[in-house]
Structure formats: structure tokens, C-alpha cells
């Protein structure tokens, strides 16, 4: 919004508002976006926590889980609303409203946030321990993920929505046989010119998997004070750098990455996500005053997945978000092994003491803060590995 306002003022009053040219610089707007989201979160955080407490929106804790967590019963949840509102206000202020990629990320983020909000509301307010039925939740996630995937399949290769429509119609007219341009290929990191052509259906499937998978993986990771939000900040910031490089024709050519016009504007969203995340961490650090709930975790995971697809770094997201991947795999392996052994031996057995993985380490005697900080350190290292793919080829 401020970009359009600055352009209008410079156009009508160039002598008085020439200093507003600084708003055209993407890096300046990214810094301001992060600061705006951070300040909004810090200022309104206490009020949001008080309101959640007054409304008795408290976190239920499983009695058969880690016993030290029972003291957290009643801690306000659904604090992800604070994160999302901070991101929304900051992004809307500082990004170029004509950029279609930011709108796609915003729609996915708030679509998944709405799913999480309904899930949290049913759990906490309506006292339904299951929240949304898993099938219902997956249905809505799939709907949003598929809509985004179909649009992105054609938009990452074109510079405008009109050209996106033309590409789509050519694909339909070819009997669904035309391939996508090379920009839509799956990039294999650490290799100079290695990519895999996905085709339209392959791109849609991969995009759907990345968006929905990332959303659920972040949600599964959000089980300890501060555990999920800091990796989200780190991975989101790293993806912001990829967006900046991919959106710049000079840098992308030098680093042998596909140039996606308009992708650089995603840096504004990533900066807002980092600022809002750090503000939330102020209140979510041990001992947490508030939890983000599904409304925050599902939304942030969906945002990371969507950004990774747009900047063509799906594999790198898996590297940098390795903690999210391992946490999700730990749950899948635990459930699958339990069902298999119960069917074969009549009694279910477990691979881990408790899933997700962070609870396994708690059961082994690690303190909660040890698990959290060590997972942060691992994420920092993985983000450095991911960023190294910019040059190490």
C-alpha cells in the first residue's frame, strides 16, 4: 500500500516527496516490514494474551503425556492469531499490491489459518478433544493446496496472469500433453545444471505435497515452548534470501538459478513472518505465556511450503526444515509400526518412547529447554547448509 502511495506523491509532488524513492528499494521495505511486524506483536501481545485468558481459551494437556507438561494446562492458546495479524498488517503496508505471488502466499497462509482456528475452537471452546475430524481437516487442506498448486504450475513460468491463462489454455488445447517451461523444473541442489522436468501433473502433485506436508509438519513440531516458532523464523528468513535472489535477474543468472519475475517481493512477507515470529517468541519462550495453536502452526507451515515452491527450492526446504521433516516422520513411523505389530503380534509396539520426536527426548530425561535449544541449533546448521547451495554447485 505504501508503495502505491509513495508513487502517487512522487508523481504529483516530485519536489516535496522525492525522498520517498527509498520506498522503491526492496531491502528497505523488507527491513521495515520486519520491524513493523515485530513492534505490532510486542505491543499487542499482552492484550491478546489477556483476552484469550478472559475468554478461557486455554490449552488442554494430555494426562498420559509428559507429566511435567501438566502445569501448562490452561495456558492461553490460539496465539497464532497475533502472528497472522502482525504478518497481514505489515505485509499489506510494505509490499507491492500488484504482485501476484504475495497474494497467493497470503491466501494459503490465511486459508490454513482458518482451518487451524476452527480446529482450535472446537477443541478449546466446544470442549471437543478431537477438534476437526482428521478427514475434514485434510479435505480443506487439500482443497486449498490443490488450488494453489494448479495456479502456481502455470504462474511461476509467466510474468502476468494473462500469460498464465494463455499457457493454461495451450496446455488444455494440446490434450494436456504440453510440458511446462524449464523454470518449473525441480532443481537438484549442489549441482550446477541438474534439474528434473516435472510436467504439469508432476508439478501439481509435488506442490500439493510440499504445501500440505509442510503445514502438518510444523503443526506436529509445535509441542514445546518456543520449539516451532524459531525454526519457522530461521527457515522463513533463508527462503526470503532465495526469493530475493530468484527475483533479481542479475543475481539469479550469476548463481545459476531460474529467474522468477516478481518472486523478490516475497522477501517482504518473509521479513514480516520473521518479525512476527520473534515477537511471538517473546511470549512463547519457556515458560510460555501463550501457545500458537493450530491456527498459527498450520498457517506458517503452509506459508513456508508455498514460498519454497515459488522460488523453486522444494528440496532445499526439506534440508533447512529438517527438524520439521524428522518430527513428521517420527509420528508416521510410530503409528505405522504400532499398527503393524498389533496386527502381527496382537500387541502394539513402539519405536520411540513417545512421538513426536521431541517428546521421546523428554522421556529420556532431557529438560524441555535442552530439547528446544538443541533443535534450534540443528535448524541453524541446516539453514546454513541450505544457503550454501546458492554457491556450492
From Swiss-Prot:
UniProt keyword terms in alphabetical order: Cell cycle, Cell division, Cell inner membrane, Cell membrane, Cell shape, Cell wall biogenesis/degradation, Magnesium, Membrane, Metal-binding, Peptidoglycan synthesis, Transferase, Transmembrane, Transmembrane helix
Needed cofactors: Mg(2+)
Example of a GO cellular component annotation carried by this entry: plasma membrane
Membrane topology: Multi-pass membrane protein
EC number(s) recorded for this UniProt protein: 2.7.8.13
GO-annotated biological processes: cell division; cell wall organization; peptidoglycan biosynthetic process; regulation of cell shape
Pathway(s) this gene product operates in, as recorded in its UniProt entry: Cell wall biogenesis; peptidoglycan biosynthesis
Pfam families tied to this protein: Glycos_transf_4 (PF00953), MraY_sig1 (PF10555)
GO molecular function annotations of the record: metal ion binding; phospho-N-acetylmuramoyl-pentapeptide-transferase activity; UDP-N-acetylmuramoyl-L-alanyl-D-glutamyl-meso-2,6-diaminopimelyl-D-alanyl-D-alanine:undecaprenyl-phosphate transferase activity
Parts of the chain that traverse the membrane: 29-49, 75-95, 101-121, 138-158, 194-214, 226-246, 263-283, 290-310, 315-335, 370-390
Places the protein is found: Cell inner membrane
Catalytic activity as recorded in UniProt: UDP-N-acetyl-alpha-D-muramoyl-L-alanyl-gamma-D-glutamyl-meso-2,6-diaminopimeloyl-D-alanyl-D-alanine + di-trans,octa-cis-undecaprenyl phosphate = di-trans,octa-cis-undecaprenyl diphospho-N-acetyl-alpha-D-muramoyl-L-alanyl-D-glutamyl-meso-2,6-diaminopimeloyl-D-alanyl-D-alanine + UMP
NCBIfam families (UniProt xref): mraY (TIGR00445)
UniProt similarity note: Belongs to the glycosyltransferase 4 family. MraY subfamily.
Function: Catalyzes the initial step of the lipid cycle reactions in the biosynthesis of the cell wall peptidoglycan: transfers peptidoglycan precursor phospho-MurNAc-pentapeptide from UDP-MurNAc-pentapeptide onto the lipid carrier undecaprenyl phosphate, yielding undecaprenyl-pyrophosphoryl-MurNAc-pentapeptide, known as lipid I.
Name of the protein this chain belongs to: Phospho-N-acetylmuramoyl-pentapeptide-transferase
Source species taxonomy: Bacteria, Pseudomonadati, Pseudomonadota, Betaproteobacteria, Burkholderiales
Gene: mraY
